[in-house]
């Protein structure tokens, strides 16, 4: 470790958290202690002399979005076992990870950004990463089939602008969970 570094980076580098995103989540949840004191600031500067602990249970997904989708699946009784799913607005892949842990057979992770999807998901043969793709340009032909389930957590664009494209990616009768952002 360098003489001083950000807490979230150090937790990931030392393997106390599997990724920087999970480190940030654990910090935000009050699960990280520096020298016996809870620390809720991911950018806090730590040194090699500091004692770092992660207590309790951090989120079980690569991103916090997975918690949102997991709760929706639970409340609405949606079973993803064996389904082909789309994660629209994948980012780090919280929804993708949740879908896989819920039994999805395959997930197409679509995001207009680049190099955001967690490396564990990029390496997973059940995941097709379609980064750099505007969701409005995605088609069933691009996927090779219509999906059985769609999860959407798009940012920086109104859900209303992408909903027609999203609906075109799934077959009739398929379920979808789409988050609505208050800024739109």
Segments predicted by a language model, with ranges:
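A short glycine-rich, Lys/Arg-flanked "PGG" loop and its adjoining helix->strand segment in the class I
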Residues: 160-180
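Conserved S-adenosyl-L-methionine
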Residues: 98-106
């Amino acid at each position: 470790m360098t003489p001083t570094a950000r807490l979230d980076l150090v937790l990931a580098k030392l393997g106390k958290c599997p990724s920087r995103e999970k480190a940030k989540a654990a910090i935000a949840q009050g699960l990280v202690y520096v020298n016996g004191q809870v620390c809720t600031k991911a950018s806090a500067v730590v040194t090699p002399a500091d004692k770092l602990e992660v207590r309790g249970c951090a989120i079980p997904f690569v991103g916090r979005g997975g918690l949102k989708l997991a709760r929706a699946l639970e409340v609405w009784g949606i079973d993803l076992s064996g389904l082909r799913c789309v994660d629209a607005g994948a980012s780090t892949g919280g929804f993708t990870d949740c879908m896989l842990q819920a039994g999805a057979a395959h997930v197409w992770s679509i995001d207009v950004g680049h190099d955001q999807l967690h490396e564990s998901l990029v390496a997973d043969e059940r995941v097709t990463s379609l980064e750099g793709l505007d969701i409005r340009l995605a088609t069933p032909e691009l996927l090779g089939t219509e999906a059985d389930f769609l999860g959407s957590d798009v940012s920086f664009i109104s859900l209303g602008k992408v909903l027609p494209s999203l609906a075109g990616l799934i077959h009739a009768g398929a379920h979808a969970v789409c988050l609505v952002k208050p800024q739109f």
